[in-house]
Amino acid sequence: MKVFPALTSALVALGTAGVEAEHVQRSLVMGGGTVPVGAKTYTVGLRTTAEGDTFCGGALISPTHVLTTATCTASLGSGPAEWAAVGTHYLNGAKDGERLKVVSAQNHTLYNPNNFAYNFAVLTLEKPSKFSPVKLPAADGSDIAPSMSSKLMGWGDTSYPNGARANELQSVELRVVTSNCTYTVGPSEVCAGGEEGKDKCAGDTGGPLIKENGSGDADDILIGLASWGMPCGHKDVASVYARVSAGLEWINSVIKK
């Protein structure tokens, strides 16, 4: 990692590190806008109660499995992930989508909490979701290319510092950075972002980074999960995402049991 000791890195990844002494408000999780109601329904909000606030993101990858980061299986100051809100547009409540009980969580066997290598976890749901899962990437990493456009979804803070969670699902366009990333990253990670005011932020950890591969959501490919980085939206500072293709063999071994 570039300069952070493990504890500071963890706090940044979870969005709990102290903010810097600046007061410029920045449009974040989005720099874009609100996802249309009924779109990107494979996006999952992790909650401690069925109708409580989402504290982490994830993606539905099979009718009974959610992929998120291993950091999200810890408490994050909110308690364990007991519920997965699938297909919902909102931060909390029961207006739409479905709320499914999480019955088990399994972290990647190579997950390292000190540097966030292989930051993957698979959650198993009590019953199948009615929503369609997102497509997983090719194992050879060919779904990622230098400077390609990607999109992040989440309910995280929409301004920095002193931001507040988004009540409605947000998305932001981010450029993938495959070389000259701000940080030293391993083969299980990929960087994205670097444009001022466009970034993941507190509350977005675990959220899906996708490649839009066609005209509809059914063509979307899950390439990453929001993992860690500096406080949000800094110019020329890309954030780090768990590279899904790097964990694919393990992911498939879990969901096919």
From Swiss-Prot:
Induction: Expressed during pathogen infection. The keyword Disulfide bond applies. GO terms for molecular function: serine-type endopeptidase activity. Residues 29-256 form the Peptidase S1 domain. SUPFAM superfamilies: Trypsin-like serine proteases. Disulfide bonds join C56-C72, C181-C191, C201-C232. Secreted effector that suppresses host plant glucan elicitor-mediated defense responses. Targets host endoglucanase EGaseA and inhibits the EGaseA-mediated release of elicitor-active glucan oligosaccharides from P.sojae cell walls. Interacts with host endoglucanases EGaseA. It comes from the Eukaryota. This is Glucanase inhibitor protein 1. InterPro entries: Peptidase_S1 (IPR050430), Peptidase_S1_PA (IPR009003), Peptidase_S1_PA_chymotrypsin (IPR043504), Peptidase_S1A (IPR001314), Trypsin_dom (IPR001254). GO terms for biological process: proteolysis.
